[in-house]
Amino acid sequence: MLDPAQAKTIIAEELERLRERIIANMRAQNAVASGRTIKSLRVVMTADGGALVSDQQMPFGVLETGRRGGRIPYGFSAIIYQWMQDNGVHATVIPYKTNRPHKYTEQERSDRSMASAIAHTIARSGSRLYRTGGRDTIYSNVIPETVERIENRITGMMSAYVDEMIPINNTEIGGK
């Protein structure tokens, strides 16, 4: 008999496989900044099917298209600065010209200045990925394969069900 639970299991398995492939592609393309997007990817099953969703506020498409220029969130340079600290990226030191006490060390001042410059460039022109035309190697290449695999598995399940229900070789139903 045709089992809807089996179809949902197939969908859940394929969506989990899709999630794993997207994560592998993100790592292979060096598209992991903080790891929050990877942690937020999850498979959600409903009564009608399922979906792969991200809890991040940023649109998921930015992973392939990049961020266009325009308005940036408040504190964007602080976000970039934190990313720089997390990944060990540092600017060339800009020495102070006075000997008075300063709020930041020379390195921290240089890093904050670099983060502000990067934020300004992204706000004005967009990210480098956006300026170079984006890519299609994170999820665009694996979604069609996943849809095809789901179709093939569900179709196989349906054809097995139909084979059970339809008499073969002109045999009558009920054994007559």
State where each predicted segment sits.
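Charge-rich, low-complexity N-terminal segments
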Residues: 1-51
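Charged, low-complexity interaction tracts
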Residues: 36-176
